[in-house]
């Protein structure tokens, strides 16, 4: 019989070990954020790391109802699907690189910048010349106008989550290299395009500074967003069931006629 092995946990009759430590030695002793570090990095976070990761997760807990990932969740909830189905709709709608995938892309951008060994200004110029997106910057709601310093500082002040996290980073005297580069890119990009830092850009710098790897970036976004999805699911239960069908019943006569004509021609009808 095939056997699965792991070097980080053991479960037996009456015992559970996580990285060699009995689970009862962790329950009541570690916070959830500390357990994340313990599981993913086999270490306890420094006080400033724990405070910052906690703050980041809190910042994700409210996105309103305009975010694409909330749509699938809310539609599922409206037909009285269980919360698990709504949560899966939320996660499925979030998987694309232009939504939750943006955090991982932003983290990989920062890694590439470090590998290239060029300045933030050179990185921005290269990406713009190539017509490539710089992940972690720009937002459909939180905008600013282009301009040279000191107006470039505005690009850190548009998104309230960015504003709060960077203020906390300054208060904690954050010395991480990746967050520093995020802010440098932000200033350079703002001067050229008036594009501000967004929450993914700040998070990319912070998470890399804290030692987390890009391939698990989705973990943090899902952890932070699920409470919001649960609240939306509960709210939808008080609405009229299946109320979103109205969005799907508007006929497009032009489209229908085109399709009908193509079908008619393919069947040898009038030309």
Give residue spans per PLM region:
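Non-transmembrane, aqueous-exposed alpha-helical and coiled segments at domain scale
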Residues: 1-271
